[in-house]
Amino acid sequence: KGELVVIMIHGWGGGTEAPKPQLELQKALGDVYVVAPLYPRAQIMEKYNIEKDGRAIWNDSWSLNLTVPGTPHDDWRGGGDANGTTMSSYDVVDELLARLSDRALYPNLKKIVLAGYSAGGQFVGRYVAVGKGVVRDGIALEYAAMAPSTYLLPNSTDTWHYGIGNRPRYSRDMSEEQIMGNLRRRRCLHGCGSLDVGEKSLDKTPCAMKQGENRFARYQNFKALVEKDSRWAEKVVFHTFDSIAHEASKAYADPYLLKYMKEVK
């Protein structure tokens, strides 16, 4: 029937091939399109011996040292531009949404879920705040941001993507009121595994460490922040993946998440 589309955003080590949970999610949900845009980094292409062939590449300013931040302006996780371009990682999602909103191509489409895990969860959480999020009437657009290394704290003057200072081109001209307006009207599931307390690929920059010692602690602290704002909390669903560490495939197979993706409010 083509009533559901999931746009799946890969993690920090992805960007050169479809994410591993893509086919598993497609099988679990049944009649669904799963679309997975890629945001490669030069480091990942070198790791897999992939030559630079003209494709867009992000994050040249970010080193392998997880205690040292790069610039937000080339970081795909927060809408930064591909190196040497004015194409934001969020522009790609906007183009996908425009394409999916074409009634002639997808006449039965009722719901789109932008979902991401780990670095993909960072991407989604920030798109909720600043993304255009435009779809045609009759399509519900919802979000699932899972197990991110860090969260956007809209009440913080820290640099993007931890706070709202020094935002990249895509969201530079937005006001704080617009950002909070998006957060208070867009439905998003935030999830994290109860055992996600390891340090693999964990952001350890000073701004990140202020959010907590590990992903699960940061998730709990973010939940407490959201619950202080009743209008924001009304649109947020928090879900703890029981007995799961940092394991994307297990999270995407979680029955609660699958139900969230399928249901149309």
Predicted regions: what they are:
Residues K1, Q26-G30, Y106-N108, A119, ...:
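Extracellular/periplasmic catalytic domains that process cell-envelope and extracellular macromolecules
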Residues E3-K111, Q122:
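Serine-hydrolase catalytic machinery in alpha/beta-hydrolase-like enzymes
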Residues L38-A42, S149, I244:
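Short beta-to-alpha linker loops that shape the active-site pocket of alpha/beta-hydrolase fold enzymes
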Residues A82-D94, N214-Y219, A248-A253:
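Phosphate/oxyanion-binding active-site loops and adjacent basic polyanion-contact surfaces
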Residues K111-V113, E142:
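Residue in the alpha/beta-hydrolase core beta-strand immediately N-terminal to the catalytic nucleophile
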Residues G116-V124:
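Gly/Ala-rich beta-loop-alpha elbow adjacent to hydrolase catalytic centers
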Residues R136-K228, H246:
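The feature captures the conserved acid-bearing segment of alpha/beta-hydrolase catalytic domains
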Residues G191, D203, K223-K265:
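C-terminal catalytic histidine-bearing segment of alpha/beta-hydrolase fold enzymes
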